[in-house]
């Protein structure tokens, strides 16, 4: 594993158990894994950027070789270079993810040919989980246990107790 440093990026709005599975698996493959939280300019955030970062940090706190980094704006390859990353880590749930990632990898490789991209297939029972589906469940106050880390559940319960709009 010597010298292999990974970067797994996303908006994590919110972080799901699917994301966590990818992060845990990557932590066994790399000496160090950075998890870069970004804002997606094509999506309006459900949770604030700060709250997403906080929940993600709480979710990965038991993984000693994982560090959450905030990169509100910019390109993943720029952050990867800044952190001396050797590999971008991407998760695939289905063929739609594959098509999207193939296009993204083309541009990442053009911008940073020295950084390799690796793909991890989602664990079968976690493939249906997506942040957008979780947001729908939260909006209707449906149970999310088993779909997201405890940090997300705690935050949603806190907001529901205060009757706040998320």
UniProtKB/Swiss-Prot annotation:
EC number(s) from the headed UniProt entry: 2.7.7.3
Pathway of action: Cofactor biosynthesis; coenzyme A biosynthesis; CoA from (R)-pantothenate: step 4/5
Pfam families in UniProt: CTP_transf_like
Organism superkingdom: Bacteria
Catalyses which reaction(s): (R)-4'-phosphopantetheine + ATP + H(+) = 3'-dephospho-CoA + diphosphate
UniProt entry tagged with the keyword Cell cycle: no
Keywords: ATP-binding, Coenzyme A biosynthesis, Cytoplasm, Magnesium, Nucleotide-binding, Nucleotidyltransferase, Transferase
EC class of the enzyme, as a word: transferase
SUPFAM superfamilies, A to Z: Nucleotidylyl transferase (SSF52374)
Annotated binding of substrate, by residue: 11, 43, 76, 90
Localization terms from the record: Cytoplasm
Summary of the function given for this chain in its UniProt record: Reversibly transfers an adenylyl group from ATP to 4'-phosphopantetheine, yielding dephospho-CoA (dPCoA) and pyrophosphate.
Quaternary state and interactors: Homohexamer.
Protein family per UniProt: Belongs to the bacterial CoaD family.
Protein name: Phosphopantetheine adenylyltransferase
Gene: coaD
